[in-house]
Amino acid sequence: MALSGIELLDHAHRLDSFDCGKPALNAWLAGFARTNQARGFTRVPVVHDEGTVVGYYGLAPGVIQPNSAPRAIRTGRPPDPIPCLLIGQLAVDHRYAGQGVGSGLVKDALYRCVAGADIVGGRAVVVRAIDAEAERYWQSWGFIPARDNPSVLMRSIQDVSLWLADKGH
């Protein structure tokens, strides 16, 4: 096993054996990740084992409605809608679970979100949890549910930036 660093998905990466145990996330990687990235909708950083993708996430710009956002995100008279960065998917092949691949991908995503917000603006990092297990996972990273939808979770860019600096990540 020789895990790569995190790099953008390309045509050399093999996707056919990826299985995170969640069919929707498997299907998105196989059916949409390359096309969405090529069309500029999403960036898809991956970790691979000798070319076979073992973990990935999708990153895209997005917006949230102020009435959905927690107070920490909607203070200071933000625009309507509020610009954000969306971690649209996050998955690790079940054969690589518990090896730090997911944590590494989350930290990379958070760094990229802070860097992106420094360039184009953005008030929050937003995730859309696929199920209750994913909701709990993102809450363990300090994300809080939207006021109107517990499957949409967010964390302010300022909070993420401070957390990354404080933890020495």
Regions found by a protein language model. Name each.
Residues 1-35, 39, 44:
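Short amphipathic alpha-helix that is part of the acyltransferase structural core
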Residues 106, 131-134, 150-157:
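Short glycine/proline-centered loop/turn elements that form peptide/ligand docking sites
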Residues 42, 56-89:
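Conserved acyl-donor/pantetheine-binding loop and adjacent beta-alpha core of acyl/acetyltransferases
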Residues 114, 120-121, 128-148:
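Conserved active-site alpha-helix within GNAT-family acetyltransferase domains
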Residues 98-112:
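Conserved acetyl-CoA-binding loop-helix of GNAT-fold acetyltransferases
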Residues 48-53:
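A glycine-centered beta-loop-beta connector
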Residues 88-98:
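A short, internal acetyl-CoA/4′-phosphopantetheine-binding micro-motif in the GNAT/acyltransferase core
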